[in-house]
Curated annotation (Swiss-Prot):
Its main location: cytoplasm. GO terms for cellular component: COPI vesicle coat; Golgi membrane. This is Coatomer subunit delta-1. Oligomeric complex that consists of at least the alpha, beta, beta', gamma, delta, epsilon and zeta subunits. PROSITE patterns: MHD (PS51072). Keywords: Cytoplasm, Cytoplasmic vesicle, ER-Golgi transport, Golgi apparatus, Membrane, Protein transport, Transport. Gene3D superfamilies: 3.30.450.60, Mu homology domain, subdomain B. It comes from Oryza sativa subsp. japonica (Rice). InterPro entries: AP2_Mu_C_sf, Coatomer_dsu, Longin-like_dom_sf, MHD. Residues 215-244 are annotated as: Disordered. It is a peripheral membrane protein. Belongs to the adaptor complexes medium subunit family. Delta-COP subfamily. The keyword Cytoplasm applies.
Length: 524
């Protein structure tokens, strides 16, 4: 079964939302959708219609059509099952089933279609699972929003307090005016100007009678209700005049955020943006990406709670003509290694000859700029001796200080790049005192985390240490330690040894890249 496109169109054939699952030009998909209303007869009970090249499987939804475009060799029963799933998803994301409602929720519908259909094949998911996948709730995002809302509420309380103080001063000034202490006659209106983070004002005087009382009137400005403003109110003061603009306060606010560990993106010149090195797109017709992700939990006293390696072989083909290929692979015989192939891959050929090829030889691999995962594998049951990086933390309290010694030891089989060891610290007023370190360090005051960075760990520095001092703290405060790194080799050592063309001619040129990434690596 191959679903070419899933679309929602109007009765006249106007495309509202369309998601293509194969490489198809815009002109072709618009032509197919525009031709559909002419093929549907009135009063017929069929849910599909066929042409010379494609099959339309459809369902009316109020004044619209929910439509699947498939090839004629697809299984009509599976197509109808896919259509039923999409018909349940559309009302979940677009309660208003008209042109305006569908267009407003176009992106949500496309995301839902992607979760229901992959590479033209229906995924074994339910409506509830699709909604859960599309929500993508993040605990870190929720915590960040709560923290920002707390700051907003705190700022609002400060502004209310300042406003209350100004109102109190205004009432006191009114009493003084009635008592004859002011030399300015007539009513006054006190104008309060609030900045985003504080209350600001000018240093205008309010009368000669009040000058002898020693009251601080810099926090507000007064202006007569009617008539022209007086010269005293309009003339700029010397040294105490109102400062227009927020440049100085904005800079101070940004500096305070930087001190708390926030990442501030500042404006840069276009020339500097263009000068940044951007990753080059693949130039070879075929690119193979081999990636393994580590999920490791190590006990602080020794031993491993969890050691899981998950790998993926993904293929990127730039041109359709180069998609008629098979990949010959090889790997090390690692205990606990198990493979899982894509449903469209010939499993018998893979298990017997370690060849990655499509079930249908006449069907090429998908082409374009996106990678297609073909093979996945998992390695379980490895012990502590197989860890690429071991980290030990030794905190000790001595008097009014806590001395923390941390050391790492890397395995011989990997050269590790961009290593970052993040140690949580107790809440501190200032950065910890780092006495000795192999590498570089940075203190994130906002999250109270000390980051130890090593650019490269190879034969020259398989081990290293760091020592720092903080105020007295419980030893458990410095855990869990999070570790991040990458390597250019993998545990399985899986690689492509050659490409077999399925059609006459030379095999296309190919490149491959392997990477090991620490997705979740902790010492607890």
């Amino acid at each position: 079964m191959v679903v070419l496109a899933a679309s929602i169109i109007s009765k006249s054939g106007k495309a509202l939302v369309s998601r293509q699952f194969v490489d198809m030009s815009r002109i072709r998909i618009e032509g197919l959708l525009a031709a559909f209303p002419k093929l549907v007869g009135t009063g017929k009970q069929h849910t599909y219609v066929e042409t010379e090249n494609v099959r339309y499987v459809y369902q009316p939804i109020e004044g619209l059509y929910l439509l699947l475009i498939t090839n004629k060799q697809s299984n009509i029963l599976e197509d109808l099952d896919t259509l039923r799933l999409l018909s349940k998803l559309v009302p979940e994301y677009s309660p208003s089933l008209d042109e305006e409602g569908v267009c407003k929720t176009a992106f949500e519908l496309i995301f839902a279609f992607d979760e229901a259909i992959s590479l033209g094949n229906k995924e074994n998911v339910t409506v509830q699972q699709v909604k859960q996948y599309c929500e993508m709730e993040s605990h870190e995002e929720k915590a960040h929003k709560l923290m920002m809302q707390s700051k907003i509420n705190e700022t609002r309380d400060v502004m209310k307090k300042k406003a209350s103080e100004l109102d109190k001063m205004r009432m006191e000034r009114g009493k003084l005016d009635k008592g004859g202490y002011s030399s300015i006659s007539g009513p006054r209106v006190i104008e309060k100007t609030f900045n985003d983070m504080s209350i600001t004002g000018s240093g205008f005087g309010s009368g000669s009678g009040l000058g002898g009382l020693g009251m601080d009137m810099d926090s507000f400005a007064s202006k007569p209700k009617g008539g022209r403003p007086s010269a005293a109110a309009t003339a700029p003061g010397k040294g105490l005049g109102m400062k227009l603009g927020k440049t100085q306060k904005t800079n101070q606010f940004l500096e305070s955020l930087k001190a708390e560990g926030e990442v501030i993106l500042e404006d840069v010149q276009p020339s500097s943006v263009q000068s940044r090195a951007s990753p080059l797109p693949p130039s070879d017709p075929v690119t193979v990406t081999i990636e393994e992700k580590l999920n490791v939990t190590v006990k602080r006293d020794g031993g491993v709670n969890n050691f899981d390696v998950q790998g993926t072989l993904a293929l990127q083909v730039l041109n359709d003509a180069d998609g008629f290929i098979q990949l010959q692979i090889e790997n090390q015989d690692v205990p606990g290694l198990s493979f899982k192939t894509h449903p469209n891959i010939n499993k018998d050929l893979f298990n017997s000859q370690q060849v990655v090829g499509a079930k249908d030889p006449n069907r090429p691999f998908p082409s374009g700029q996106n990678e297609t995962p073909l093979v996945k594998w998992r390695i379980q049951g490895m012990d502590e001796s197989s860890l690429p990086l071991s980290v030990n933390c030794w905190p000790s309290v001595s008097g009014s200080e806590t001395y923390v010694n941390i050391e790492y030891e890397a395995a011989e089989m990997f050269d590790l790049h961009n290593v970052v060891i993040s140690i949580p610290l107790p809440a501190l007023r200032e950065a910890p005192s780092v006495r000795q370190i192999d590498g570089e360090w940075k203190y994130d005051s906002r999250n109270s985390v000390l980051e130890w960075s090593i650019l490269l760990i190879d034969q020259s520095n398989r081990s290293g240490s760091m020592e720092f001092v903080v105020p007295p703290a419980d030893p458990s405060t410095f855990f869990p330690i999070s570790i991040g790194f990458s390597a250019s080799s993998t545990f399985s050592d899986l690689k492509v040894t050659g490409i077999r063309p399925l059609k006459d001619g030379n095999p296309p040129k190919y490149s491959q890249r392997a990477r090991l990434v620490a997705a979740n690596y902790q010492v607890v």
